[in-house]
């Protein structure tokens, strides 16, 4: 299937997994005289995933392989800003895969410019969200570059056909037909899809989960952490200041040991279909709960309602791959303004799969025990409520009278 399109040099987003292992030789065979450069994004997927990846890329057809450490930038410039908005997609998904795509696309474009490439290539399938996320970022950052999406071109249609393709060319791979789950990992989370999970009536087996302890097997005693928050950002745990990345790693370790952060959801993909995924986001779940605790104290009713609107809009923006847009900048600016008052400390309790903000305080707290008390009250005249209620319910009263 020789391509008629002329491409001189292409940068491939390379993971070393089955799909991208096939893409390198496929490009070599189907694009004449095209130099292939592999780009590997280290977003915290783990040392095991990266071990030997440069040698593997070169052996599979790449002329060069760039491994770029993006872990700190991912947490500081993508995860922390998203946390500040409060974004949670469809009320459950903490956007682990979605947040990583724009930084990977951005770094891929930077490598392309560095090596003088005229094309970009990704290994996303034609059924998923990631093809849209990557290509939307490419369009915003490098509209002049050609984009190659092999899954929308080639005649390889299954995992088995990819394995056969590599076997015919004596290209080694750790993948096998029995490794049935599709997984995506970074510093924030790991996702699991495929296999028996494709039937939502099937309960996830124990082998699905890889990052967190089964809540049943978690410690029988709870663990407590004190989370410090400054302007909507977590700055310290138990009084120890850490970088955003190190904070996340610490909370991942602590929360995973208690089985915190597991979700099993059916989500609406951008391409129109529903998909089922199991996600593990231990540290992130603790962070979201801690920030929610501060938010409850410091934002008044109408401001919090607006914050929830920002959160919902931003969750769809990130999920849909629209990071490099004016809307993203606007929503981040709004979240930054709202976060000015989000300062304080929260004590969270982790126990057998759950995390709760059980104590909270803030110098900007709007909570007044004097006004809220059910005991003796000298600051609030309860008789004042009568006039408010009559005005508040006036439209209902008028409608009822008019219908008589």
From Swiss-Prot:
Which terms are listed as keywords in the entry? Amino-acid biosynthesis, Arginine biosynthesis, ATP-binding, Cytoplasm, Ligase, Nucleotide-binding
Q: Which residues does the record give as ATP binding sites?
A: 13-21, 41, 123
Q: Which cysteines are joined by disulfide bonds?
A: none
- Catalytic activity field: L-citrulline + L-aspartate + ATP = 2-(N(omega)-L-arginino)succinate + AMP + diphosphate + H(+)
What InterPro entries does its record include? Arginosuc_syn_C, Arginosuc_syn_N, Arginosuc_synth, Arginosuc_synth_CS, Arginosuc_synth_type_1_subfam, AS_cat/multimer_dom_body, Rossmann-like_a/b/a_fold
GO molecular function annotations of the record = argininosuccinate synthase activity; ATP binding
Q: Does the keyword Protease apply?
A: no
- CDD domains given for it? ASS
Give the Enzyme Commission number.
Answer: 6.3.4.5
Q: What Pfam families has UniProt attached to this entry?
A: Arginosuc_syn_C, Arginosuc_synth
Quick one: which pathway? Amino-acid biosynthesis; L-arginine biosynthesis; L-arginine from L-ornithine and carbamoyl phosphate: step 2/3
PROSITE patterns for the chain: ARGININOSUCCIN_SYN_1, ARGININOSUCCIN_SYN_2
User: Which NCBIfam families does this entry report, sorted A to Z?
Assistant: argG, PRK00509.1
**Family statement drawn from the similarity comment of this UniProt entry:** Belongs to the argininosuccinate synthase family. Type 1 subfamily.
Q: HAMAP family attached here?
A: Arg_succ_synth_type1
Name under which the protein is recorded: Argininosuccinate synthase
Q: Which organism is it from?
A: Moritella profunda
Lineage of origin: Bacteria, Pseudomonadati, Pseudomonadota, Gammaproteobacteria, Alteromonadales
Q: Which gene encodes it?
A: argG
């Amino acid at each position: 299937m020789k391509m008629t399109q002329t491409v001189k040099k292409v940068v491939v987003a390379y993971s070393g997994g089955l799909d991208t292992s096939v893409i390198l030789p496929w490009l070599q065979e189907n694009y004449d005289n095209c130099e292939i450069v592999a780009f590997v994004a280290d977003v915290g997927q783990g040392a095991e995933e990266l071990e030997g990846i440069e040698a593997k890329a070169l052996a599979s057809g790449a002329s060069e392989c760039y491994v770029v450490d993006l872990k700190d930038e991912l947490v500081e410039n993508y995860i922390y800003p998203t946390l500040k908005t409060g974004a949670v997609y469809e009320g459950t998904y903490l956007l682990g895969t979605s947040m990583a795509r724009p930084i990977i696309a951005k770094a891929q474009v930077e490598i392309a410019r560095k090596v003088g490439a005229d094309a970009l290539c990704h290994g996303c399938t034609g059924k998923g969200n990631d093809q849209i996320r990557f290509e939307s970022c490419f369009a915003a950052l490098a509209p002049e570059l050609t984009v190659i999406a092999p899954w929308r071109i080639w005649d390889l249609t299954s995992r088995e056909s990819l394995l056969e393709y590599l076997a015919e060319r004596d290209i080694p791979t750790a993948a096998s037909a029995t490794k049935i789950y599709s997984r995506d990992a970074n510093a924030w989370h790991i996702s699991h899809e495929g296999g028996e999970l494709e039937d939502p009536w099937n309960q996830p087996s124990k082998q699905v989960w890889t990052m967190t302890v089964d809540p049943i097997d978690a410690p029988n005693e709870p663990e407590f952490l004190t989370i410090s928050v400054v302007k909507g950002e977590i700055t310290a745990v138990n009084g120890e200041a850490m970088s955003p990345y190190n904070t996340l790693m610490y909370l991942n370790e602590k929360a995973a040991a208690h089985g915190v952060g597991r979700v099993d959801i059916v989500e609406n993909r951008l391409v129109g279909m529903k998909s089922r995924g199991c996600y593990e986001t231990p540290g992130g779940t603790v962070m979201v709960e801690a920030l929610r605790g501060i938010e409850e104290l410091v934002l008044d009713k109408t401001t919090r309602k607006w914050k929830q609107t920002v959160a919902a809009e931003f969750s769809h923006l990130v999920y849909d791959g629209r990071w490099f847009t004016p809307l993203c900048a606007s929503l981040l600016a709004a979240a930054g303004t709202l976060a000015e008052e989000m300062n304080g400390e929260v004590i969270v309790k982790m126990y057998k799969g759950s995390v709760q903000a059980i104590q909270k305080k803030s110098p900007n707290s709007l909570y007044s025990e004097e006004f809220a008390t059910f005991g003796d009250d000298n600051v609030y005249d309860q008789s004042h409520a009568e006039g408010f209620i009559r005005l508040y319910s006036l439209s209902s009263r008028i409608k009822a009278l008019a219908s008589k």
